Amino acid sequence: IIKCKKCPRLIRFSKKISITKRKQNILDVYWGKPVTGFGDINAKLLILGLAPAAHGGTRTGRAFTGDKSGDFLFRCLHKIGISNLPSSTHRKDGLILNSTYITNFLKCAPPSDKPLNLELNNCSNYFDNEIKNLTKLKVIISLGKIAFDNCIKFYKKNFIIKEKFIFKHGAKYNLPDGKILIPCYHPSPRNVNTKVIDTQKMIKLLKFVKKIL
């Protein structure tokens, strides 16, 4: 994955932000390559985002690491025992996930957080491989509507689906391969600041997921 060159626009953007950097990260050496998933290969739970953050995963080389969305997510994961640490700051911070794997559908940060359909299609094979390699997987939590929509789109490519899937926080959908999909509001700073998602809502959803694993 980290050697992928399928999407020239995304490669250019990753290189650009790795050179220009953000003021508070000016001394950091940016990863600047596609970002793979990470976690327990025997995971029963998959947490799926859309794409790595420009100055989060693209900087640190790990999904939901080094950005505010990750800060919120890992505080919640730690509180219910899924993560051994309450934060995710860099690839060698000693973080361990319990029966959980975290990835993004798109492996590179898109400009303005708006990926093209071609770019999403280019990445779908990587997601396919992740799903196949996680042989004990039972539940997928999709963070945000776009990640949810692309997960459904992926399944529609591979299975005949008649059910209508609508993004609703905390809903439970049975997928045709026996897995369960649960939509969740994305823990973005905007959603957290406007109380669309808060610690209580996230913990409640995660506790529900733990019961069905």
Question: What would you call each of these model-derived segments?
Answer:
Residues I2-L213:
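A polyanion-binding, active-site-adjacent surface
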